[in-house]
Amino acid sequence: MGLLDPSQKEVLKFAVSCRILTLVLQALFNIIIPDHHADAFSPPRLAPSGSVDQLVEALLGGLSRWDAEHFLFIAEHGYLYEHNFAFFPGFPLALLMGTELLRPLQGLLSERSCLLVSVALLNSLFSVLAAVALHDLGCLVLHCPRQAFCAALLFCLSPANVFLAAGYSEALFAFLTFSAMGQLERGRGWASGLLFALAAGVRSNGLVSVGFLLHSQCRGFCSSLVVLDPLKGLVKLMASLCLSVLTVSLPFALFQYYAYTQFCFPGSAHAIPEPLLRLASDRGYRLAGDYEPPWCSRAPPLIYSYIQDVYWNVGLLRYYELRQVPNFLLATPVTVLVVWATWTYVTAHPWLCLTLGLQRTKDRESLEKPHPGFLSAKVFVYLVHAAALLAFGGLCMHVQVLTRLLGSSTPITYWFPAYLLQDREPLLRCVDTAPQKLLENSPPGQKAPRNCVMKLLYNWKTCSPVTKCILVYFLTYWLLGLIMHCNFLPWT
C-alpha cells in the first residue's frame, strides 16, 4: 500500500499525535508526581551530570523506570552482570546506533542523556512504524479495510502504551513482528524469516513466531500434493522447516553462546569500574570470572532459562499466590479479550480449527465465500499464536506482563476489538468502507473526524456498552500506565 493511501495517512497522523502526547504526559507526570522508592535495579551514574543532563532527566527520566534501566545499562556498559542476560541485545544495539547519530551532542550531553534521547526518538519511530505495519497486515489478512483501519488506530491507544514509549524492547519487537507477518502474507518467505529472526534477537517470545513460517510451508505442501510427487514434496518440506527453525533461532543461540564464553571460560573477566564492582558486591550480582555458575555444566548450558528460574522465579504456576491477586486483576482484561476472540473464532469455524487451518471447510461451496474481517480463514494462525502466548504467559510468567506481551506480539488484541466495534456499534456498522465516510454525528461547529476512534469518543453517550468497555479499557491502561510506570509505581 502506498504512503498516500488516505487511511494509511490517517493512521500515521494519529500514531504521531499519540507518540507526542505520550512523551509530553510522561514528562508532566514525572515532574509533578514524586517517585516511589522501588527495590529495582539502579546502577550508579559514573559520569558527572551537567545542567542539560538534569533537564533531560527531568523530561525523559520517566522512560528509564523498571526494566528500562537494564536496557540502558547494557547499552552503556555491556553485559556485566549475569542477570543482564535476561534482556536480549537487539534493543540495546538499536540504542547504541541512536547514540552514534547523536554524537555531535556528546560534548553537551552525557552518554546516559544521549541514551534517553535515543529511547524517546527510536521508540516513537518504532511505534509509528508498527502502527503502519499493523494496518498493512490487517488489509492483507482481514480483507476488510474498515477493521484493518480501526485496529491500527486502537494500536495507537494500546493498553501497553507506556512500554511502547519507555526504554523497553516492545516497540521495536512489534514493528519487526508485524512487518515479518506482512512479508509472509505477500509470499516473501526469505524477507519474513529474516525479520522474524531479528525479532527473536529483540525478545525471547520472538522464537514462537517461527510457527508462522512452519504453518505457511505446511499449507503450501498440502495445496501442492495434487501436482507434486508426495515424497519429493515431503523432503522439500522437511528441509524448509528445518531451515526456518535454524534461521529464527540463530540469534538466540548466538546470544546464549556469547553468555557461555563470558561466564564459563577461564580468564573471561573484563576490567570493571569500581562503583559497578561495589554494586555487585552489595547486591550479590554475579560477574564474569567470579566462579563458574551452575548453568555452565548443564546440557544445554542456557543462561536464559537459568536466570528466569533463579532471578525472576518464572515457572509453571509459581506466580499463583494470594499476594499476586492484584497482578492477576491487571491481566484480566487482555485475558478476557483473547479468550473471547478464541471462542468466537472456534465456534464460527470448528472444521477449520480441527484441520489446523490447512483445509478450510468440508463444503466446497463455502470455500468460495470467504469471511471478511476477523472471521477470515487467514486469521487462524494468528489466533493460535495469541492463544499460545496467553496460555504460556498465564501459567508460567508474571501475569501482569501479559498486557505488554500480547499487546506487542499479536495483532489479535487489536483485530478482535475492531471486529467487535464494527459488529456491535451502530455508529460504525452502517458506515461505508472508506474511513473518510465517518463524518456524521459529530458535535455542532466541529469538523467531523475521519478517525473512527475519535468519532466514537465524540459520540460517547450514544455508544453501545461493548464499545464503552473497549474504549475504557484501552484509554484507562494507556493513561494509568504512564502515571504509574513513570514514577516507579507497580506497573510492569
Swiss-Prot record:
Share the record's PTM remark.
Answer: Not N-glycosylated.
Q: Which residues lie on this side of the membrane: Lumenal?
A: 35-77, 135-136, 183-192, 256-327, 400-468
Q: How does it sit in the membrane?
A: Multi-pass membrane protein
* Highest taxon, organism lineage: Eukaryota
Q: Which residues cross the membrane?
A: 14-34, 78-98, 114-134, 137-157, 162-182, 193-213, 235-255, 328-348, 379-399, 469-489
Q: Which UniProt keywords apply?
A: Endoplasmic reticulum, Glycosyltransferase, GPI-anchor biosynthesis, Membrane, Transferase, Transmembrane, Transmembrane helix
Q: What EC number(s) are associated with this protein in UniProt?
A: 2.4.1.-
Pfam families the UniProt entry points to: Mannosyl_trans2
Pathway in which this enzyme or protein is active = Glycolipid biosynthesis; glycosylphosphatidylinositol-anchor biosynthesis
- Compartments where found: Endoplasmic reticulum membrane
Q: Which InterPro entries match?
A: PIG-V/Gpi18 (IPR007315)
Which cellular component appears as one GO term in the record? endoplasmic reticulum membrane
Q: Which GO terms describe its molecular function?
A: alpha-1,6-mannosyltransferase activity; glycolipid mannosyltransferase activity; mannosyltransferase activity
Give me the Cytoplasmic side stretches, as residue ranges. Answer: 1-13, 99-113, 158-161, 214-234, 349-378, 490-492
Among the GO biological process terms of this entry, one is: GPI anchor biosynthetic process
What function is annotated for this protein?
Answer: Alpha-1,6-mannosyltransferase that catalyzes the transfer of the second mannose, via an alpha-1,6 bond, from a dolichol-phosphate-mannose (Dol-P-Man) to the alpha-D-Man-(1->4)-alpha-D-GlcN-(1->6)-(1-radyl,2-acyl-sn-glycero-3-phospho)-2-acyl-inositol (also termed H2) intermediate to generate an alpha-D-Man-(1->6)-alpha-D-Man-(1->4)-alpha-D-GlcN-(1->6)-(1-radyl,2-acyl-sn-glycero-3-phospho)-2-acyl-inositol (also termed H3) and participates in the seventh step of the glycosylphosphatidylinositol-anchor biosynthesis.
Q: Which family does it belong to?
A: Belongs to the PIGV family.
Return the protein name: GPI alpha-1,6-mannosyltransferase 2
Starting at the broadest rank, the lineage of the source organism is:
Eukaryota, Metazoa, Chordata, Craniata, Vertebrata
